[in-house]
Amino acid sequence: MAVVLPLGTIATLTPATGSAIVLNCISITGTTRSVAMADITALSDYMLKKLPSRVDPGTVTFEVYLEDTATATNTLKTLRDWQATVTGSSIGYNSVTLSINFPGSTIDALISYQGYISGITEPTVGASDEALRFSVTLQVTAV
């Protein structure tokens, strides 16, 4: 379930190298951590035996406004570039840190996730009175 954030909530995306992007955040759909179980059952065992093995930190999806500025298309392009950077015959991936700052909070980066951009939805443009929105999905690698 998405959490609707108060007006003025800022999402800052900071790449491992380069400049950060600041976006007005609308909502965040949080991550669900899960643990895969390894089967350690021997052939002679009559009951399955399993142990926790690897932790999957999950994904975080956040929805933001497409700003009505000259840099709006640059923001989408930068996010796409961060998703997968192709240089010649090699593909590089950019780790990003998502930090959420709530209005009125004296704590910077109250919520922070680190990971890789795994999906970007394009804004739906049509005849409506709503602001343009798009969402970004981050595969979390560290919390």
Residue ranges: model-predicted function:
Residues 1, 59-86:
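Charged, amphipathic alpha-helical segments
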Residues 130-143:
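Short solvent-exposed strand/turn elements
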Residues 61-63, 99, 137-139:
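Residues within well-ordered beta-strands of beta-sheet-rich folds
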Residues 73-114:
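Short, acidic/charged, Gly/Pro-enriched secondary-structure junctions
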Residues 1-16, 87-101:
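Short, compositionally biased strand/turn segments
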Residues 2-68, 114-133:
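Solvent-exposed edge beta-strands and adjacent loop segments
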